[in-house]
Amino acid sequence: KLGEVILGDNPLVPVVGLTRAECEGFCQWLTKSERDNPNADLNRITKDYRYRLPTDLEWSKMAGLIEVGETPAERESEIVNSGQFPWGESFPPDEQVGNYADLSAVEFLKNGRIIEGYNDGFEKLAPVGGFKPNVIGLYDIGGNVHEWVLDSYGNTERGILRGGGWDTFSEEHLEMRCRFPFDIEYRSESFGFRVVLIRDVEQEVIEQSEDDGGNSN
């Protein structure tokens, strides 16, 4: 069972090392497990809802960015969001604002490059919720793991990751507007994901059609 395998044996840290398709597969498994249980009392969501990866624009909204571009590439280039970091507008960050490339992680980084003078105390992954949430109450929007979103980057087969991870050190890559284009089949111990719960529009259309006797007119 993909979902159970993905969850692993340590629920405190993010799941990593998945392709984008595997992340989407987990969302499908989670939806089914929480709304299609034979014992209706165990269902946590109704059939009107489902889980999926966030879109690129949804991720930006969760991070508090205001963007107007039509595509991820256009939104990334918007100067108004330059210098906006998960912790504020200054660089380098104060200590203990998130899990980034730091003194604790230096031996695990291929190039040994870190945020100079920064130490969050974690070599690699940190427990979810180990740092303060952002202004809307979400944890680890910046750092810990790069997060897959639904969109592709431009007219390419590359997917997009947002947020930076425990191995991110550069000022440019830590800006919240930054997008990381990667092959959707690529795996990394710093790549993870978060899920969003949405109203299932397709399911609503099906139900409406049934209510109308199956007529589309």
Task: Identify the residue ranges that each predicted region occupies.
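Short, structured beta-strand segments at or near domain termini in extracellular proteins/domains
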Residues: 189-204
